Design a protein with these regions (language model features):
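Immediate post-signal peptide segment of exported/extracytoplasmic ligand-binding proteins
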Residues: 1-5, 113-116
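Small-molecule-sensing regulatory modules
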Residues: 2-49, 53-54, 61, 128-129, ...
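Short, well-ordered beta-strand segments
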Residues: 5-7, 76, 94, 120-121, ...
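Signature of uroporphyrinogen-III synthase
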Residues: 21, 288-432, 437-440
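Alpha-to-beta junction loops
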Residues: 69-78, 165-170
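A conserved helix-loop-strand patch within extracytoplasmic ligand-binding domains
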Residues: 80-81, 87-146, 203, 393-400
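Ser/Thr/Gly-rich flexible loops in soluble cytosolic domains mediating phosphotransfer, phosphorylation
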Residues: 94-123, 199-211, 359-391, 427-429
Length: 440
């Protein structure tokens, strides 16, 4: 088999992504030889102009596409979100592979956590639009004002700019940080160590798709080839993830309907789950139309129509009714207070009613947005949420390393992969044993 030439941008992240694709090809074609080619693009050279103000589209991809057309490379690996929604003739996106995390990541200086007026670095109109309201509620300091400032450069450059500036935080694609941290090659060990070292002075927050849908195709890699290169296309058919391809095409089609381009203030994410699929859409069109949809479509095998015609879920005889009261469990606050350097998964906000303190070395994750906002109102920094998808469909994580997780819930909580700390229990009563405090 011929040597397969893979071209990408020169950035640390772009080279990691090219190598991920190269390794995937070698899994199916172990005798192949891979050659990596790196190239600066217009977007890499002009680091001053905000992306949404650049006069041309495809500033990170057009120069690389030319190398394909000139037969200098066999395939190009892009961050798919960098590609224009309209592809020019001569090349096609032939494949993609498993998608990384779709979500955005906020990194925030620890020294800025209590500030009421904060500034965040991002050049994305979408992020500015959707985070300007959510972060006012989600940050424990309850800031009065958020100012956004444009920033350019690769991931390490952007983090350095944050640490050397008066800005308080930086928003970027979580997939970028994940790929850098998870990279096991020695090619970029120095850069990886620099990133991890910066995180010692930073808090982080994974931003939920229900409130901040990603850019279409975020987290996905586009593998571009010449349209007539049947040999390379046949190779890529073996590694293509058709489900991811379908999700990305759906996201890009929705953005295209509103005009397309990185200047749009629109986020759209399509997630494939074991139980169905979710479409998150939020932002504002150029005509001022506000968009906000979170649509779940279950798989047929998970639909349950048995309760569809039930009109009354209460017992016909009131004497058969049961009443429940919530009682705190003694010593649970003491147990939780002693936990450090672990993950705390909070199933609902009232599971922490009696909890005044959680060590700041811990990661806090919530079951949904409502619980997140309740905890932030009490001054807790929340790192992320399962976004009401369940702890198995959207599990908690520490982006920097593996840790032990504890689940804060009631004493009859279902079996979990986490160690459960029961902070309350439900006590049932009948109409005959109901305490006087419940009687009106």
């Amino acid at each position: 088999m011929k040597t397969i030439k893979i071209i990408s941008r020169k950035s640390h992240l772009a080279q990691i992504q090219a190598e991920i694709v190269g390794m995937k090809i070698l899994q199916y074609f172990p005798t192949s030889k891979i050659e990596y080619i790196k190239k600066d693009t217009q977007g890499d050279i002009d680091l001053d102009t905000p992306l949404h103000k650049m006069p041309e589209i495809g500033v990170f991809t057009n120069d690389i596409r030319e190398e394909l057309i000139n037969n200098s490379a066999d395939l190009a690996v892009h961050s798919w979100k960098d590609l224009p929604v309209e592809m020019e003739q001569g090349t096609i996106i032939s494949a993609t592979i498993d998608r990384a995390d779709l979500r955005d990541l906020l990194i925030f200086k620890k020294q800025s956590i209590t500030k009421k007026n904060i500034s965040l670095l991002t050049s994305s109109p979408r992020r500015k639009e959707n985070l300007s309201s959510f972060l006012l509620k989600a940050l424990p300091s309850k800031p009065e004002e958020i100012q956004f400032m444009d920033i350019r450069g690769n991931i390490l450059t952007r983090i350095k700019k944050l640490m050397e500036s008066d800005a308080d935080g930086l928003v970027m694609a979580k997939a970028a940080i994940d790929r850098i941290i998870e990279d096991e090659s020695r090619n970029f060990l120095k850069e990886k160590e620099e990133v991890l070292n910066y995180f010692k002075d930073l808090n982080w927050m994974v931003l939920p798709l229900s409130e901040n849908p990603a850019a279409p195709a975020q987290g996905a890699l586009a593998i571009e080839t010449r349209s007539d290169d049947e040999e390379t296309i046949e190779i890529l058919n073996k590694i293509n993830n058709s489900e991811v391809f379908r999700s990305v095409e759906k996201e890009r089609a929705i953005l295209k309907k509103y005009g397309g381009g990185c200047h749009q203030k629109i986020g759209v994410s399509h997630q494939l789950l074991d139980v169905g699929e979710i479409l998150n859409l939020k932002g504002e069109t150029e005509d001022g139309l506000r968009l906000y949809e979170n649509i779940f479509t279950p798989k047929e095998s998970f639909k349950d129509d048995s309760l569809e015609n039930v009109k009354n879920f209460y017992p016909e005889n009131p004497e058969n009714s049961s009443f429940f009261d919530r009682q705190n469990i003694k010593d649970s606050a003491k147990i939780l207070k002693e936990i450090t350097n672990a993950g705390i998964y909070v199933s609902r906000s009232n599971a922490l009613d009696e909890i005044k303190e959680i060590d700041r070395s811990n990661i806090i994750w919530t079951s949904g947005i409502k619980t997140w906002l309740s905890l932030s109102n009490r001054g807790f920094w929340v790192n992320g949420t399962s976004d009401s998808l369940g702890e198995m469909e959207s599990p908690p994580e520490n982006i920097l390393k593996k840790i032990k997780w504890y689940k804060i819930s009631h004493d009859a909580s279902p079996i979990s992969d986490k160690e459960t700390i029961s902070t309350y229990k439900s006590v049932s009563y009948t109409h005959l044993t109901l305490p006087t405090k419940f009687v009106v």
